[in-house]
């Protein structure tokens, strides 16, 4: 999973204008980087200009996906990722970046400008590009799911380690005093049913 670019654009008026961006071009060859960067800017300006206020859309192109979020204030965020990057964290990140940009730079600063300047940059954009390469950083639900998956892995390893010490689950079931006779019978019947489908 990879984020290649985060861009903030003004999409009110005749043509969209990139106000600031952060790009990670490390996976591209040295001589390709300038062209790739220009294409990302072109892509961002094109899709921002064609996305209505309040709309979100994801555009797939080859191995890349452009996630676009256009706000009613005339501001638009474009996140270019690979196909594996999840959609929900992408839009969570775009929403966060656009909120912070509007706090740092009210619309009066950028609404009527002809070209961008360094004063319109968002200093945290490079940090976000690095931090949110891991989508669980952007999405707390995804982070909780990842923690649950890790806990499940630990539980599986614990059960496997008990069984690897020479104990068999059948013996444990037979010795268990906490299982009723019907539970033991159910376990044995389920084991027989499942074993009939195995190819030896």
UniProtKB/Swiss-Prot annotation:
v-SNARE coiled-coil homology domain: residues covered: 140-200
Lipoprotein found in the keyword field: yes
Major site of localization recorded for this protein: membrane
Domain Longin: start-end pairs: 7-126
Propeptide: 198-200
A UniProt-annotated Pfam family: Longin
Disulfide pairings: none
Lipid-linked residues (S-farnesyl cysteine): 197
GO molecular function: palmitoyltransferase activity; SNAP receptor activity
Name of the protein described by the UniProt record: Synaptobrevin homolog YKT6
Lineage of the organism: Eukaryota, Fungi, Dikarya, Ascomycota, Saccharomycotina
């Amino acid at each position: 999973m990879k984020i290649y670019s985060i861009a903030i654009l003004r999409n009110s008026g005749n043509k969209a204008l990139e106000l600031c961006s952060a790009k990670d071009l490390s996976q591209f060859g040295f001589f390709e980087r300038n062209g790739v960067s220009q294409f990302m800017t072109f892509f961002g300006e094109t899709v921002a200009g064609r996305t209505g206020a309040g709309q979100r859309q994801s555009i797939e192109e080859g191995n890349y996906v452009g996630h676009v979020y256009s706000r009613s204030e005339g501001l638009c965020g474009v996140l270019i990722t690979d196909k594996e990057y999840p959609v929900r964290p992408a839009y969570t990140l775009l929403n966060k970046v656009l909120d912070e940009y509007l706090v740092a730079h009210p619309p009066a600063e950028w609404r009527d400008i002809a070209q961008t300047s360094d004063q319109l940059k968002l200093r945290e954009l490079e940090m976000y590009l690095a931090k949110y390469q891991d989508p669980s950083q952007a999405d707390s639900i995804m982070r909780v799911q990842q923690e649950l998956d890790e806990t499940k892995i630990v539980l599986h390893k614990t059960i496997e380690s008990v069984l690897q010490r020479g104990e068999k689950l059948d013996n444990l079931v037979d010795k268990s005093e906490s299982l009723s006779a019907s539970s033991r019978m159910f376990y044995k019947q389920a084991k027989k049913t499942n074993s009939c489908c195995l190819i030896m």
